[in-house]
From Swiss-Prot:
Gene Ontology biological-process entries: glycolytic process; tricarboxylic acid cycle
Assembly notes: Homodimer. Part of the 2-oxoglutarate dehydrogenase (OGDH) complex composed of E1 (2-oxoglutarate dehydrogenase), E2 (dihydrolipoamide succinyltransferase) and E3 (dihydrolipoamide dehydrogenase); the complex contains multiple copies of the three enzymatic components (E1, E2 and E3).
Needed cofactors: thiamine diphosphate
Alphabetical keyword list: Glycolysis, Oxidoreductase, Thiamine pyrophosphate
The name this protein goes by in its record: 2-oxoglutarate dehydrogenase E1 component
EC annotation from Swiss-Prot or TrEMBL: 1.2.4.2
Taxonomic lineage from the root: Bacteria, Bacillati, Bacillota, Bacilli, Bacillales
InterPro entries in UniProt: 2oxoglutarate_DH_E1, 2oxoglutarate_DH_E1_bac, DH_E1, KGD_C_sf, ODO-1/KGD_C, THDP-binding, Transketolase-like_Pyr-bd
Any one cellular-component term (Gene Ontology): oxoglutarate dehydrogenase complex
Length: 932
């Protein structure tokens, strides 16, 4: 394949109606260069060295008296801005546009003769060397801007990007395919179309979400990956919903036809998995429908060895977008070094395929696009392809969006948008070429709107004519792109009509041969759907011990700063207190310091850490201070980049004000780099429910559905402290509802040392079959609570404990109170004021998996026990009560009374008034500590 493109030198900018003034300034420049602004000095220097420019400008200027130039400039500007409204981008059922701006020569009282007398340089700053006059140039622009590709870029604020696009679009360029390449492209389309037709005929009514109508998507992806291969990009991450997914799996990831057809026949597809290991397909024990599944292909089919990944995706359209971005960034980051990661955007690229109804309809897209240029999230430019079949299930565009195009919402992110006719396959290839060039040049997103149609209903059981009869009258009569392109090649003499039909038949023959290999009796039989044995146990404690000197060395390093670095005095006093656990007998390690010490030891073990969230560098509650700021210069210093013997990176970023996209990004990052300790911290745990789709459809179910492992950790500040219903609850109950089959660990801690050991245990589980998400109901006021802070000897040895108790005299205990997190601390502090040896407080540090054995063993040691009580801050219908009740009920059986103390059932999580909160909280504590 060759690209014929005429290169031209840089020429002066448009002057339009100000041309006369510019010529006067040019004369001034010739007399005294310093008499004009610096930018014009540079421009006029170029003009001075090109004898052809000034005469052309002066000739043009003489015709300017009647406003001709002004009208020419308005015409040119309109073509660039609005030519897309008359572009030939609709294969069928073109919309009837109203109020289209003026776009014709006659609309501006211009004619051929007038335009032939004007320099082509007026039309575009690089046309003077290409066309004889403005008329020729305008004809070229009309053809370009009203052709099978509609370009939108004038909304971009960056002048360099806008100028690059203008020159790239307007410079004569044609993707020239030789005959062999045209035949190869036709064969690609024949395979795409033939696959769909075969399934449609042989598995009538089976859902497959056909690609027909936007078939060019597959050649576009193949072209993209080929260009990426030439550029040395060896990791391609693709995200898409279900439309066309089976075709992408078979023709981009090269999943064998036998495997795909086996899934339609409900037989075991894995017997047809390539033995060379080039195709990785993971599976969970519950499984998922075939059009949600992804895979990873290692192949050199596109010119170099590449890893092509199609992400697993639920039916929640578009939610995979941030996951793909996170996976891409993980592939780009080098984390096996001290300090911060280095990011090479040339290592990997994301391709995200959207639907035209879902793209403007789902806010996750805009959260994700907002990540595009942020330091902590950029992937060097994503290629977005809208598979625009101009319908969403039964909803037509007039009811689906408030804009002209589904892509209009992308304009706010300053990205170019190309609309391309899905029936013009060569135009779709050109759109990809320009998009990839732009990404390479500017490392920014590009959106391609592949405008086609949907051959059948939303799924193959659906009859679209019930709700959309008129469009489907024309769609049913419209030839497939395979036939459209095939006839074009026949007319060009590239292939004969017999060859065209012969190859179409050959595709069907290959599919039939694959079908015949499958034994219908080989049915899949897995009624028990058992989870892996590795998940039988809870997260295992990390029993590694540390010497006092080792932790002191780390602590000293974290409190050492560059010479001349000026820390705010108020903050410096806080940080200096972190020396006390090592030089004072009564010194205690608080929550933030425990975290810093844990992170440092994890980095020494060679596990990279990535922590993101709103305000996470400092911490919402001003406790972490992981990134320090010089109060005089504003420069930053990150102590965790300078840990002694550090073997992996520490990466921390304040996230944008987004939850869903950021959590999806971190999930994807961890799936791609399973060695990375990824942590997302909510500003308040209450806001975590903005990410509920990621929790439900990925984090807690991905391994069960897809065999996709994640060890993402969530820090969710949670405690009832009188701050109202939106700053109290991380909705603990929802995470406990999602907990099953040892798919996660959920904790609510009361000890800084237990937090230290928990973080180390989670880090140790990464990249193993034991890895799973960790949910931490993290503290707020407890961050500085001395009851939570612990002496350093609790950090030098031991491991994570699922339950904690104080010392007790077994025969005196008649009442056991089970509580968690801040509720446990409140009870402990209240009991300290009025000691009662008959009451034993037990901190349930790990809620899931529930520590039944540990509690049962404890209760067995108490011969005079009469009552077990569960105490919580949350309303009875929230928090942990409904989750723990079945477990505790079994433990107490008929031996002890079981009671509940907490807020009554409420619709809202907490009281809005701080004083009322205190009254309610104190009453709960008072009632709980009564020993009847």
């Amino acid at each position: 394949m060759t690209n014929e493109r005429k290169e031209v030198s840089e020429a002066p900018v448009n002057f339009g109606a100000n041309l006369g003034l510019m010529l006067d300034l040019y004369d001034d420049f010739l007399q005294d260069p310093s008499s004009v602004p610096e930018d014009l000095q540079v421009l006029f220097s170029i003009i001075k060295n090109d004898d052809s420019i000034v005469p052309a400008l002066k000739s043009t200027s003489s015709q300017n008296s009647d406003g001709t130039i002004k009208r020419v400039m308005r015409l040119i500007d309109n073509i660039r801005q609005y030519g897309h409204l008359k572009a030939d981008i609709y294969p069928v059922n073109p919309p009837k546009r109203k109020h289209v701006p003026k776009l014709e020569i006659e609309d501006f009282d211009l004619d051929q003769q007038t335009l032939e007398g004007i320099s082509a340089g007026i039309v575009s700053d690089h046309f003077a060397d290409i066309y004889d006059n403005a008329y020729e140039a305008i004809l070229r622009m009309e053809k370009r801007y009203k052709g099978p590709i509609a370009f939108e870029y004038t909304h971009i604020n960056n002048n360099t990007e806008r100028g690059w696009l203008k020159r790239r679009i307007e410079t004569p360029y044609k993707v020239t395919l030789n005959n062999n390449e045209k035949r190869a492209l036709f064969k690609q389309l024949a395979y795409v179309e033939g696959f769909e037709k075969y399934l449609h005929k042989n598995f009538v009514g089976a859902k497959r979400f056909s690609i027909e109508g936007v078939d060019a998507l597959v050649p576009m992806l193949q072209r993209t990956i080929t260009i990426a291969a030439k550029e040395g990009i060896k990791n391609i991450q693709i995200g898409m919903a279900h439309r066309g997914r089976l075709n992408v799996l078979t023709h981009v990831l090269e999943k064998p036809y036998e495997m795909m057809i086996s899934e339609f026949m409900h037989t075991d597809p894995m017997k047809f998995l390539p033995e060379d290991g080039s195709l990785q397909l993971t599976a969970g024990w519950t499984g998922d429908v075939k059009y949600h599944l992804g895979g990873i292909k290692t192949t050199d089919s596109y010119g170099t060895m590449q890893r092509i990944a199609l992400a697993n995706n639920p039916s929640h359209l578009e939610i995979v977008a941030p996951v793909v971005e996170g996976r891409t960034r993980a592939a780009q980051d080098d984390t096996q070094r001290a300090g911060a990661p280095t990011t090479d955007h040339h290592k990997a690229m994301p391709i995200i395929i959207h639907g035209d109804a879902a793209y403007p309809g789902q806010g996750i897209n805009f959260e994700t696009m907002n990540l595009g240029n942020l330091k902590g999230y950029s992937t060097g430019g994503s290629l977005h392809i809208i598979t625009n079949n101009r319908i969403g299930f039964t909803t037509e565009p007039i009811d689906a969006r408030s804009t002209t195009y589904s892509t209009d919402v992308a304009k706010g992110y300053d990205v170019p948008i190309f609309h391309v006719n899905a029936d013009d396959v060569e135009a779709t290839i050109e759109a990809i070429d320009i998009a990839m060039e732009f990404r390479k040049e500017f490392h920014k997103d590009v959106v391609i709107d592949l405008v086609g149609y949907r051959r059948f209903g939303h799924n193959e059981m659906d009859e679209p004519s019930i709700t959309n009869p008129v469009p489907y009258q024309n769609i049913r009569k419209h030839d497939s792109v395979e036939y459209v392109f095939g006839k074009k090649l026949v007319n060009e003499g590239v292939i004969s009509e017999d060859e065209m039909h012969s190859f179409i038949e050959q595709v069907q023959k290959e599919l039939r041969q694959a079908h015949d290999k499958i034994n219908k009796a080989d049915k899949m039989d897995n009624p028990d759907m058992e989870k892996p044995a590795d998940l039988a146990l809870p997260l295992q404690a990390d029993e590694q011990s540390f010497t006092f000197d080792h932790l002191k060395e780390i602590n000293d390093a974290l409190l050492t700063y560059p010479d001349g670095f000026n820390i705010l005095k108020k903050l410096n006093k806080v940080l200096e207190k972190r020396h006390e656990p090592f030089n004072k007998e009564d010194g205690l390690v608080d929550w933030a310091q425990a975290e810093q010490l844990a992170f440092a030891t994890i980095l020494q073990d060679g596990t990279p850490i990535r922590l993101t969230g709103q305000d996470s560098e400092r911490g919402t509650f001003s406790h972490r201070h992981a990134v320090l700021h010089d109060e005089q210069t504003g420069e930053t210093y990150t102590p965790l980049h300078h840990v002694p013997d550090q073997k992996a990176t520490f990466d921390i970023h304040n996230s944008p004000l987004s939850e869903a996209a950021v959590v999806g990004f971190e999930y994807g990052y961890n799936v791609e780099n399973k060695k990375s300790f990824n942590i997302w911290e909510a500003q308040y745990g209450d806001f975590a429910n903005m990410s509920q789709m990621i929790f439900d459809n990925f984090l807690f179910s991905s391994r069960s559905k897809w065999g996709e492992r994640s060890g993402l950790t969530l820090f969710l500040p949670h405690a009832y402290e009188g701050q109202g219903p939106e700053h109290s609850s991380a909705r603990l109950e929802r995470f406990l509802q999602l907990a099953a089959e040892n798919n996660c660990t959920v904790v609510n801690l009361s000890s800084s040392s237990n937090y230290f050991h928990l973080l180390r245990a989670q880090a140790a589980s990464l990249d193993s079959e034991q890895m799973r998400p960790l949910v931490v109901m993290s503290p707020k006021s407890l961050l500085r609570n001395k009851t939570v802070a612990k002496p350093i000897d609790e950090f030098t040895s031991g491991g994570f404990e699922p339950i904690l108790t104080e010392s007790y005299q077994a025969d005196k205990v008649t009442k056991v109170i089970l509580a968690t997190g801040k509720m446990f601390i409140d009870l402990k502090e209240a009991l300290a004021k009025n000691p009662d040896e008959s009451v034993l407080l037990v901190a349930i540090e790990r809620l899931y998996p529930f520590p039944e054995e540990e509690i049962e063993a404890l209760l067995a040691q108490l011969p005079n026990l009469e009552e077990v009580s569960w105490v919580q801050e949350e309303p009875k219908n929230q928090g942990a009560w409904l989750y723990v009740y079945p477990y505790v009920k079994v433990l107490v059986a008929d031996k002890y009374d079981l009671s509940y103390h907490g807020r009554i059932q409420r619709a809202a999580p907490a009281e809005g008034d701080g004083e009322i909160h205190k009254l309610v909280q104190n009453k709960i504590i008072e009632n709980a500590l009564k020993n009847n």
